[in-house]
């Protein structure tokens, strides 16, 4: 990653992935004016999907959730550039990618300081042909080898001592090759020890049960059993 420092901003970017102007690429209007917006998704604000010169990307502005987010929508206390949410997520994604976990490649990040607080943006690779696991499970039951692959992917993440604080079915993608991807590592971190891993896995199980009741997804005790086999057993 290269780094730009100017005025009240810090920008990190990968010159091999980003051919556009790093100072302009975090504004949705920049992409709209070029006709390069290829989609969007709603969550905490809008995630814009844009077509860059080298690859499709997802552009996200960091926003708070919950009650506090209604009071202070997108400002965070500044304690150092490397401790900003965007810088930490870029570092974590890089660690996971090097460790063999399928995650979006970080393209660029920007932190803008305003006195005691800052705001942040992130640009990551958009995974080609990948779909939200919940969307897929609403349509049909997945074959066992995909459930197994989900378990293996989570295990690889845990073996790198990375705790995904929002590990749920929506943050798992499956592409057209049936490769499993993990996304949305905001507020995630590395953690020593082993005890937390079972709790993290239980969190994922609760999300499947929740979506089964809410959206009637195709999920069963057998599905979870195969996922756990993938988590517990070594690769063949």
Swiss-Prot record:
This protein's pathway: Bacterial outer membrane biogenesis; LPS core biosynthesis
Pfam family, one: Kdo
GO terms (BP aspect): lipopolysaccharide core region biosynthetic process
Subcellular location: Cell inner membrane
Reaction equation(s) it catalyzes: an alpha-Kdo-(2->6)-lipid IVA + ATP = a 4-O-phospho-alpha-Kdo-(2->6)-lipid IVA + ADP + H(+)
EC numbers on record: 2.7.1.166
InterPro entries xrefs: KDO_kinase, Kinase-like_dom_sf
Residue runs in coiled coils: none
GO molecular function: ATP binding; kinase activity; phosphotransferase activity, alcohol group as acceptor
Protein's membrane topology: Peripheral membrane protein
Domain of life: Bacteria
Keywords noted in UniProt: ATP-binding, Cell inner membrane, Cell membrane, Kinase, Lipopolysaccharide biosynthesis, Membrane, Nucleotide-binding, Transferase
Active-site residues, record numbering mapped to chain: 166
GO terms for cellular component: plasma membrane
Function: Catalyzes the ATP-dependent phosphorylation of the 3-deoxy-D-manno-octulosonic acid (Kdo) residue in Kdo-lipid IV(A) at the 4-OH position.
Family: Belongs to the protein kinase superfamily. KdkA/RfaP family.
Protein name: 3-deoxy-D-manno-octulosonic acid kinase
Lineage, broadest ranks: Bacteria, Pseudomonadati, Pseudomonadota, Gammaproteobacteria, Vibrionales
